[in-house]
Amino acid sequence: MRLGLDIGGTKIEAVVIDNAGEIVYRERCATPKQSYGDFFQAVTEMISKARLAVNQSLSVGVGVPGAVDSEGLIKNSNILVLNQQAFAQDLERALGI
């Protein structure tokens, strides 16, 4: 099973698909914009909820607005709290990758 996260300026959507490509779980929440900590917590909670819902480990793919520079920092995101953050590295650390 695979988890896809679509992170946008208004919402974060999590979708889990099975090996046949069928959606087995979907959830949305508003994108927190007050702080990077709040934003990051929302993302990790979405991943945890998805894992619990399907009761197994998941591979995770994430789409975020903006570009990533050579140092792994997000640039030009419409989610201002993401700019200058090493989101991928932070997420890898949180997931134990």
What spans do the regions from the language model cover?
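Short glycine-rich anion-binding loops that position phosphate/pyrophosphate groups of nucleotides
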Residues: 10, 65-68
